[in-house]
Amino acid sequence: MVKTKFKRAVSLVMAAVLSLGVFANIGTTAYAASGTKSDVYIMQLPRSGDTNNNGKWGHGELKFMNGWYSHAISTDSLRAMGSYSGNIAYCIEPGTGQHTGDTLTEKNEDYFNNLGSNGTISGDDIRLNIGRILQYGYCGSISTSWKSQNSDDADKLSHAIATQLLIWETIVGERDESFNHKSPGSYDAILDHIQKGHPLYSRIMAYYNSMSESVQKHTKVPSFCTKSSGSAKVNELKWDGSKYVTTLTDSNGVLGNYEFSANIDGVTFSKSGNKLIVSMTKAPSKEFTITATKTNGTRKGIVVWTDGKNSPGNGIQDVVSYSQNVSDPVKGFVKMKVSYGSCKIVKTSEDGKVDGIKFTITGNGVNQTVTTANGGKFQLD
């Protein structure tokens, strides 16, 4: 009897804990913890009753960079996880098959650690670009009632299709780390997925261009910076009579979005319009690096749904959906130095005694005693 009461008490406590866990998770992320399984629901486009069904929603067979491809199709599609009215999910394996009812497993962003370079960017840069695309792309539920003749529906359809195009471009290698477009060369372009006769072509391209510009600006650093410290340009600080100083001008128009720090002490920064003034009262002993860090940089978090296989035509199509915003610290780099000159002095004397004479040289950052030699000469470097 005591044992039965104890079991009931434990059950009640566990039920309460589980209930609290359910309520605590409402509204925090789009999906549950990593490892959850869910089914794919694919919505064909155009929908029945769409008056813009002109036969231009599909495309011919396409072969993309890095072995990715698409079979010839007469329609298009969107998809969601869990139901036909679930949050939208986007394909990340062009050409790999997928059907409604296919079951995929949720993974976090570590999924991209297992992806190699696509020849343009690394797996990690693919992850970052997709998160930034989702920041400006369509994030919401889909609906089987969408019709392209309805303006609101057409807007959501166009936004979603443009988002998918940019994600595909990132996957196959048509976008670099700064989100600039790279020509596919002899391969088909992802944009060939959309015929110019598509009833939403103009709207899709408007979103495509706007989102592309937004992602590029999202990652743009001041023009005097590079994204790699190894390739950073070296600028020179010059003495102005009271301090060592230089002024850097940003032609990218993003200076106000960045804060600056140096890997040595004693460096002061100030902004004036599109100009950054860097100064020091004491000359640095060696070249140093300045880091520009974007303030309040965020992007969408990524949820990956996968069958554990990632290669063209292998297994079931993997997809990504969105979660809450995460930090996205975009950084740029620039280097600084002070060029030191040398001073050569020749001692003269009526009595000819010019060697072994000591002098003390003082000045900004200099306090040194030297001794003449070799005909009254000394050089201070």
Report residues per predicted region.
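Bacterial Sec-dependent N-terminal signal peptides
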Residues: 1-13
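Gram-negative bacterial Sec-dependent N-terminal signal peptides
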Residues: 10-24
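Sec-dependent signal peptide cleavage junction
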Residues: 20-40
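Acidic/charged, solvent-exposed loop-and-adjacent secondary-structure segments enriched in E/D, K/R, S/T
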Residues: 175-339
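Structural motif
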Residues: 345-355
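Hydrophobic beta-strand segments
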Residues: 358-361
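Short, acidic Ser/Thr/Gly-rich low-complexity loop/linker segments typical of extracellular
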Residues: 365-381
